[in-house]
């Protein structure tokens, strides 16, 4: 089997964070979110992976992952010149896939459960596709599967009046038959080739699609709130088998009279000054300094300088940002790379 990671799109709901790079490189617990996808694929034994790139900062994806050697995989990069839908991106991989079964993983999806058993089951089955489903509270945001007697009846993309709460997650197990379906697919109202439409057409053609339920944590990180929530959940997972409620990187200095309220992860070569409070649910990237600041439920990326008497909550602060704030009130920041704030 082979793997595909979708790494394109404009990430408009995450601006200004995505003005300088793709959303899939935004960090969750100090690691690019798409790296969680790559590691999940590698865990299944798949080592040939195509990464679909396009849009702002595609070069950053190549720079970070390289040829894949340091991750134990072989990476092929495939360009999608414009965002024309998930099905279109998959179709671009036809030559790469050849006649193999394959796994597709959207690079902005975070899942805690191993997918190894799902992959093994599909590999040994005669199904043309397997979709992973998860119950959600807001089904109109997702492609939705209607199930009856443990069979998929239909799949609908972002229905206005959903008749099910089972979202089709961004993880698909497919065979090359899907390429024929996509070749005959008509664009949606968004002028995109929708993977949900392709799966629904495949379902009507031969009714040979299975599904698996995800009961552990899954998040489609489409908004800042989604990313912050995923950050907290992943840090909790990282700390499950550790005695401490936090992780501190090498050469990081934590002065006396600093409160760390886990779950928290702090990167390498950071400096947290006396009087600061970090956490809960906070990640701090490498080479960041925090002086007399209170940070909660937030992501602070690399090379930042935070000197704020305010309570910083529910915030995402991108690389190389500088905050100076003497006002002392509660603040929520959503800062793109290289931001300078003085209040």
Indicate where each model-derived feature is located.
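Conserved N-terminal catalytic core of the sugar/cofactor nucleotidyltransferase
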Residues: 2-5, 13, 27, 31-105, ...
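Active-site glycine-centered loops adjacent to acidic/histidine catalytic or metal-binding residues
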Residues: 9, 108, 135, 223
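Short internal beta-strands
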Residues: 48-54, 132-133, 299, 316
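Catalytic-core segments of class I nucleotidyltransferases/pyrophosphorylases
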Residues: 110, 119, 123, 152-239
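Conserved donor-nucleotide/metal-binding helix-loop-beta segment in metal-dependent transferases, i.e.
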Residues: 113-140
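Short acidic-glycine loop/turn motifs at beta-strand connectors
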Residues: 146-151
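Internal anion-binding site segments
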Residues: 223-245, 250-251, 256-257, 275
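A structural motif detector for beta-strand N-caps
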Residues: 246, 251-258, 264, 270-272, ...
């Amino acid at each position: 089997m082979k793997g595909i990671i979708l790494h394109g799109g404009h990430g408009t709901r995450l601006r200004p964070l995505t003005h300088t790079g793709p959303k899939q490189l935004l960090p969750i617990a100090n690691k690019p979110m798409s790296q969680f996808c790559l590691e999940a694929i590698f865990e299944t034994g798949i080592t040939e992976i195509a990464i679909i790139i396009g849009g702002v900062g595609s070069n950053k994806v190549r720079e970070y992952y390289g040829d894949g050697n340091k991750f134990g995989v072989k990476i092929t990069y495939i360009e999608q010149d414009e965002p024309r839908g998930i099905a279109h991106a998959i179709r671009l991989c036809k030559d790469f896939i050849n006649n193999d079964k394959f796994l597709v993983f959207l690079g902005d999806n975070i899942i805690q459960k191993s997918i190894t058993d799902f992959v093994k089951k599909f590999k040994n089955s005669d199904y043309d596709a397997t979709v992973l489903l998860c119950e959600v509270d807001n089904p109109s945001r997702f492609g939705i599967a209607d199930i009856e007697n443990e069979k998929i009846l239909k799949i609908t993309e972002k229905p206005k009046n959903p008749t099910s709460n089972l979202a089709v997650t961004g993880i698909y197990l497919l065979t090359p038959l899907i390429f024929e379906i996509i070749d005959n697919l008509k664009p949606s109202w968004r002028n995109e080739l929708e993977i949900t439409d392709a799966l629904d057409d495949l379902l009507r053609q031969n009714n040979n699609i299975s599904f698996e339920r995800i009961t552990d944590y899954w998040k489609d990180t489409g908004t800042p709130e989604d990313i912050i929530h995923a950050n907290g959940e992943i840090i909790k997972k990282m700390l499950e088998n550790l005695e401490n409620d936090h992780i501190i990187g090498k050469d990081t200095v934590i002065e006396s009279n600093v409160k760390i309220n886990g779950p928290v992860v702090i990167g390498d070569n950071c400096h947290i000054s006396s009087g600061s409070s970090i956490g809960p649910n906070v990640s701090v990237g490498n080479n960041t300094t925090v002086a007399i600041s209170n940070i909660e439920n937030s992501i602070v990326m690399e090379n930042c300088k935070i000197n704020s008497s305010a309570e910083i909550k529910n915030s995402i602060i991108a690389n190389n940002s500088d905050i100076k704030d003497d006002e002392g009130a509660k603040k929520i920041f959503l800062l793109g790379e290289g931001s300078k704030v003085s209040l």
